[in-house]
Amino acid sequence: MPLCGSSSSSKHPIERKIVILGDGACGKTSLLNVFTRGYFPKVYEPTVFENYIHDIFVDNQHITLSLWDTAGQEEFDRLRSLSYSDTHTIMLCFSVDSRDSLENVKNKWVSEIADHCEGVKLVLVALKCDLRSSDEYGNESAITPGSIQNQKYNGGGGNGLIPYDEGLAMAKQIGALRYLECSAKMNRGVNEAFTEAARCALTATPKGARDSAPEAESSSCTIM
């Protein structure tokens, strides 16, 4: 019997599913390992499929996140399509040291999402942002939107890395609700990225194989 002033529903966390997409080797699995297990893997091992369960509190709401790690390689396209059912939010990732991974956001991933999970809420996430601030001695400076925005992109860039402004422009182009940047290696911006994705998922209707009627959505991008 619930105590006075409480409800039985408050005992049960809200369940939300988030799928993590992006090119192979862009850093998705490292991002998930740091967030759910607190460690950064030293050796790259390609992921075929893995599911993580993690509890998080957002806006005083207890949420149980089902986080689906997916393989970005083309040979896993058919297997990956099975991940989209009943998805609340997709974290679409690219690496700042791979222009192909950014171009594939619009050339591959957006169309695949439209085919399998039309209308789902999107969050665009830039990974490996510590590479922008690494100096020749391997030191790292703080990753902030201000410092990233001040770095100019000149053709291939002074260091060939994708700048903040270009990632933000892509987020607006694809209609992502959030644009976030983080470094799993340095554990900077990781919790913030999942918090914002969970916040988007809170108000989302699940999309995918058994989705319901389309819901009205704002396509504006929030800069984080």
Curated annotation (Swiss-Prot):
Keywords: Cell membrane, GTP-binding, Lipoprotein, Membrane, Methylation, Nucleotide-binding, Prenylation. Its main location: membrane. Gene3D superfamilies: P-loop containing nucleotide triphosphate hydrolases. It is found in: Cell membrane. GO terms for molecular function: GTP binding; GTPase activity; protein kinase binding. GTP binds at residues 22-29, 69-73, 127-130. It holds the Pfam family Ras. Coiled coil: none annotated. The modification Cysteine methyl ester is found at C221. The keyword Transmembrane helix does not apply. A motif (Effector region) lies at residues 44-52. Transmembrane segments: none annotated. Residues 205-224 are annotated as: Disordered. InterPro entries: P-loop_NTPase (IPR027417), Small_GTP-bd (IPR005225), Small_GTPase (IPR001806), Small_GTPase_Rho (IPR003578). It is a lipid-anchor. GO terms for cellular component: cell division site; cellular bud; cytosol; plasma membrane. Belongs to the small GTPase superfamily. Rho family. This is GTP-binding protein RHO3. It comes from Eremothecium gossypii (strain ATCC 10895 / CBS 109.51 / FGSC 9923 / NRRL Y-1056).
